[in-house]
Regions:
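Alpha/beta enzyme core
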Residues: 1-65, 73-96, 103-106
């Protein structure tokens, strides 16, 4: 998706959530970047990108952003938090806590 499409989808999700649960409860809802369970044609990882998390964070309020997929190290995690993620989805939690970089093929 393009940056504009990420922003538009985030705004759409935000508006639907606010319409359904109200603005006060919307702050309990997360908009999620991706599942991470796909491989792009360019061979990169199919997870969250710092740019997408930043765009989503700017446009999601009052919803929070969950960065999911492609987060395999403490450095990856810190970049996502700095970009605006409030929650991290990763299969590498133990490795991140140990200060290691996880090796995974999905």
């Amino acid at each position: 998706l393009t940056s504009d499409q990420v922003a538009e989808l985030t705004i759409l999700i935000r508006d639907v959530v606010i319409e359904c649960v109200g603005e006060q409860k919307a702050s309990d809802v997360f908009v999620k970047t991706s599942t991470g369970f796909y491989k792009p044609e360019d061979g990169g990882h199919g997870g969250a990108s710092v740019d997408d998390v930043s765009i989503m964070s700017i446009n999601a309020g009052p919803l929070k952003v969950k960065a999911s997929g492609g987060i395999y190290s403490r450095e990856d995690l810190e970049k996502m938090v700095d970009a605006g993620a409030s929650r991290i989805g990763t299969s590498a939690g133990i490795e991140i806590i140990r200060g290691e970089k996880a090796n995974t093929d999905y």
